[in-house]
């Protein structure tokens, strides 16, 4: 039992305060075999009859910590080799991306470095990046492939992601993103590459149990809606979930396509129109906001937040951690950016990195809320109010994380 805490449950079973948070003061959480078995006040707990709860061997005093669900980073490209700091300098000096690509930069430079790296090297690099997310209270993370673009290299990336998921203090959902870019070997033959993805990479990932989802980059510099539909159809044939990078730079209709085909989420969506929002609402598809990429690329077109609110589309928030457009390993920074750039409320941001992020990964029945029967994934904070998670940056507020019922103190 965890006692002497203030619970932000984000569960409809708990009444909301004036700011929309579901908070239980003087709260207690009971955990058995990694699952939450009791949520409520101390006076209602199974141990309420004990005169001295603090001395009970099964009780941990949390020091009046504020407790939220463990945070979920539902869109990352954590596994890769190399970095593109030189391109950051070049972009600031006015060099267009197209010119960088001609010089061998851009995504292809990351592909080359990732292909050359061993699995152990990729694993060690990813662990260093992951540590920053853990310090922000992250207990579940999604990791994509997409920097291999060959059968062997895409599977190599997914094996690294699965290996990270074997760690006791983090849960990992894996996504095959072979349809991320056209590799050099298939230059000017995007249709042929999509067939290679559908006929070889997806079946192999399924056979080896390496992928939970399949993702695509539906964009003018990526793949067309017809090509993405082919990938989605193949993924669904093999029983995999689908999601999409859509409407980041233009409006091709990829979000509506993905939603109609059953995607759990569509991500970026700066150029999403009202018809696209309606498609998300009709199909219960999560809109994942990626303010880090918006910031890093100095974009000006914001996602249609008001219309998403109007149609009650759940909004998730994620880092989009990647070497080219969002090298920011801090989910709390994304919460602050979502408030500042997109005008989300702190309460919307907290839901965006907990219950809505869980829904984006198809995990809403097991993670993202503090409720009986859910997995015991929690974050304990030394703060007064939940809004501080979005408001304050650079302060080590995390006390501990609990993952599947196991306690890990912040380092």
Swiss-Prot record:
Domain of life where this protein originates: Bacteria
Binding residues annotated for Zn(2+), in chain numbering: 75, 77, 245, 320
Obligatory cofactor(s): Zn(2+); Fe(3+)
Keywords tagged on the record: Cytoplasm, Histidine metabolism, Hydrolase, Iron, Metal-binding, Zinc
Residues annotated as binding Fe(3+): 75, 77, 245, 320
InterPro entries linked: Amidohydro-rel, HutI, Metal-dep_hydrolase_composite, Metal_Hydrolase
Localization annotation: Cytoplasm
Name of one Pfam family that matches: Amidohydro_1
Binding residue positions for 4-imidazolone-5-propanoate: 84, 147, 180, 248, 325
Pathway: Amino-acid degradation; L-histidine degradation into L-glutamate; N-formimidoyl-L-glutamate from L-histidine: step 3/3
Transmembrane segments: none
Main location per the UniProt record: cytoplasm
UniProt catalytic activity: 4-imidazolone-5-propanoate + H2O = N-formimidoyl-L-glutamate
Cofactor note: Binds 1 zinc or iron ion per subunit.
Keyword ATP-binding: no
GO biological process: L-histidine catabolic process to glutamate and formamide; L-histidine catabolic process to glutamate and formate
Chain residues that bind N-formimidoyl-L-glutamate: 147, 322, 324
Gene Ontology annotations for the cellular component aspect, listed alphabetically: cytoplasm
GO molecular function terms attached to this record: imidazolonepropionase activity; iron ion binding; zinc ion binding
EC code: 3.5.2.7
Family: Belongs to the metallo-dependent hydrolases superfamily. HutI family.
Function: Catalyzes the hydrolytic cleavage of the carbon-nitrogen bond in imidazolone-5-propanoate to yield N-formimidoyl-L-glutamate. It is the third step in the universal histidine degradation pathway.
HAMAP family named among the record's database cross-references: HutI
Protein name: Imidazolonepropionase
């Amino acid at each position: 039992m965890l006692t002497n805490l203030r619970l932000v449950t984000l569960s409809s079973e708990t009444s909301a305060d004036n700011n929309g948070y579901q908070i239980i003061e003087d709260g207690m959480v009971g955990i058995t075999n990694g699952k939450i078995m009791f949520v409520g006040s101390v006076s209602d707990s199974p141990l309420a009859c004990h005169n001295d709860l603090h001395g009970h061997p099964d009780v941990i005093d949390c020091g009046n910590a504020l407790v939220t669900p463990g945070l979920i980073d539902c869109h990352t490209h954590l596994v890769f080799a190399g970095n593109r700091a030189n391109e950051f300098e070049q972009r600031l000096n006015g060099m267009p991306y197209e010119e960088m690509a001609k010089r061998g930069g851009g995504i292809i430079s990351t592909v080359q470095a990732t292909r050359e790296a061993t699995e152990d090297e990729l694993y060690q690099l990813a662990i260093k990046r992951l540590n920053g997310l853990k310090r922000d209270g992250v207990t579940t993370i999604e990791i994509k492939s997409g920097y291999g673009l060959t059968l062997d290299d895409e599977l190599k990336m997914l094996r690294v992601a699965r290996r990270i998921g074997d760690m006791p203090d983090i849960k990992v959902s894996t996504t095959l993103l072979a349809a991320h870019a056209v590799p050099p070997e298939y230059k000017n033959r995007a249709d042929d590459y999509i067939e290679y993805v559908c006929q070889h990479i997806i079946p192999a990932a399924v056979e080896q149990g390496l992928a939970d989802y399949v993702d695509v980059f539906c964009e003018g510099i990526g793949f067309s809606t017809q090509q993405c539909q082919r990938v989605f159809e193949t993924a669904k044939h093999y029983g995999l979930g689908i999601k999409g990078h859509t409407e980041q730079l233009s409006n091709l209709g990829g979000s509506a396509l993905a939603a109609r085909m059953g995607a759990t989420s569509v991500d970026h969506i700066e150029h999403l129109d009202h018809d696209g929002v309606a498609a998300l609402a009709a199909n219960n598809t999560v809109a994942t906001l990626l303010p880090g990429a918006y910031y890093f690329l100095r974009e000006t077109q914001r996602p249609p937040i008001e219309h998403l609110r109007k149609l009650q589309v759940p909004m998730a928030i994620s880092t989009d951690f990647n070497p080219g457009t969002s090298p920011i390993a801090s989910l709390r920074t994304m919460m602050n950016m979502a408030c500042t750039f997109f005008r989300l409320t702190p309460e919307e941001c907290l839901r965006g990195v907990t219950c809505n992020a869980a829904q984006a990964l198809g995990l809403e029945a097991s993670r993202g809320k503090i409720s009986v029967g859910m997995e015991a994934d929690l974050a304990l904070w030394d703060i007064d109010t939940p809004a501080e998670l979005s408001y304050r940056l650079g302060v080590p507020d995390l006390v501990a994380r609990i993952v599947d019922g196991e306690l890990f103190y912040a380092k």
